[in-house]
Amino acid sequence: MKHVARGRTITLLLAVLVVCRPASAQIDLSGEWSVVRAEDNVGNTELGDWVGIPMNEASRLRSTAWDASIQTLPEWQCRPHGSAYISRGPSALKIWNEVDPVSRETTAWHLEWLRSVDRPVYMDGRPHPSPNAAHTWAGFSTGEWVGDMLRVRVTHLKEEYLKRNGVWHSDKIELTQYLIRRGDYLTYLVIAYDPVYLSEPLVRSTEYRLNVNQQIPPYPCTVVNEVDRPKGVVPHYLPGTNNDIGWFSRKYGIPMDVVTAGAANMYPEIRAKIPRSMGGSGPEPPPQPATQPRTQRPAPRAGQQ
């Protein structure tokens, strides 16, 4: 009888421990969030700004062919921003959770930005679909808690831009995202892996601040004829014809071989290639030869044109 009583006591204690175990460190991420601008997320990008992106040669060739006028095509005007880019734009963010009515557990988080689509993050452990499954602007997302951080894996994304200056990612991209809340601030960290256009992972982060007065409005979009151009014309540049690529380099005095260095320009050692007068530690460029003044063309004589 003593053994039976002892067994019952142990069973009861185990049951109490199970019932009274501390809840897993899950943070409430729901709310309306406004983007916080900082030095690493300043809004509109500039032509030829490839600094800080591990672009490979295929990515550089694709970027030099890009023409901003492609956004005026009817097929492009109402395209939503994809999951790899949207957090870098100016759009506000709304997060809410989906709760199982019986267990009261969160089965999915939903993330939606203005000018984007609802992106569910499934928390029920379901597997990602086949690589041949449909790819969408939002992709397919699953999440799990790592301490007090929500880690999200995103696959099945359509090909789209990483930056709105012609830097692209392929449909083979995979994202690892971390959502970290600290009071009224939310850090949104994105790590992008793309075997087609990136030579190594691209890491970017965005800060959001809770905004209780914010409400993301609907975003209806109507396709119109913005530019009168011949049917079938797609704006683009052929190789070697895009003179705007060097604009960023000329504006800020950054050598073009630094701008196009790919992964190398993400690390401090690249300063050795930047002249001291431009904030680096490298040698000054050789002086440019003096420009010869143009000879003034004589005025045409009477009867000449």
Predicted regions and their residues:
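Coiled-coil-like amphipathic alpha-helices with heptad-repeat character
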Residues: 1-3, 16, 57, 296
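Bacterial N-terminal signal peptides that target proteins for export
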Residues: 1-11
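Short alpha-helical segments used as structural interaction elements across diverse proteins
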Residues: 3-5, 18, 85
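Bacterial N-terminal signal peptides
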Residues: 9-20
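PEST-like low-complexity, intrinsically disordered acidic/proline/serine-rich tracts
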Residues: 24-305
